[in-house]
Amino acid sequence: LGVHGVTQPDGSTITLSNAALVWVPLLLLATVAAWFGMNDIAGSKASIRDQLPVLKRPHMWLLSLLYLATFGSFIGFSAGFAMLAKTQFPAVDILKLAFFGPFIGALARSFGGIISDRLGGVRVTLVNFVLMALFTGLLFLTLPGSGSGSFLAFYVVFMGLFLTAGLGSGSTFQMIAVIFRQLTIDSVKQRGGSDEEAQHEAVTDTAAALGFISAIGAIGGFFIPKAFGTSLAMTGSPVGAMKVFFVFYVVCVLVTWLVYGRRKSA
């Protein structure tokens, strides 16, 4: 439906759209596996009307903020890292190295969940946000600025950001599930509901919260590249966007500690 092939200065043709075809057999395989191997859980079905009440809970929006800072950072950095590196270090062929960041972040997500199950999601998330703020601060020192900068330092620090964004995605996801389940059970018990009612409503509310929060977290895929682009267009440097990210991560440290770290969510 779009342009089929783009002619390069040397006369050759590059067809980027063909790269997407590699996913076709994998998608077909996943479709067949899902059709024959997955089953719906009848007890977990809920209408949109049943799910909307979670939007009234303050924890829904606080946890959305934290998930935006982790998962949103992961997909946002994945989208904007190559562009940022190319503008700051044009002599480096970043296309050969850019994929390592998303790869590290994707692997780290599962480890974030595993570690959180053992040490607690709040503790892991808190430490993770401190590290994300630290890496963002270190990133300022690697940029060209008045000197030539250091691509090696820039790359290593950014890999640290990918790692922590991935770990945080797993730990905040674990937090959401644990916190909303307990909140719902406590709420049902307070109004005199049975254990069965509490468990059923907890499943519905937790699933709804995870769905809404995941959608909000995906905004980072747009916001971060846009922030870098706007900062570069206005000032010629990504420093403005990075300052915003640094402050954002510090705010997330405070929210995690003050709301969930010092006392039980209630």
PLM feature segments, named:
Residues 2-24, 227-249:
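A membrane-interface helix-boundary motif in multi-pass transporters
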Residues 2-6, 19-44, 255-259:
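C-terminal membrane-cytosol helix-exit motif in multi-pass small-molecule transporters
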Residues 39-64:
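Juxtamembrane intracellular "pre-TM" segments in multi-pass secondary transporters
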Residues 57-106, 169, 173-174, 224-225:
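Extracytoplasmic gate region of multi-pass secondary transporters
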Residues 109-121:
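Helix-to-loop junctions at the C-terminal end of transmembrane segments
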Residues 190-234:
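A late C-terminal transmembrane helix in Major Facilitator Superfamily
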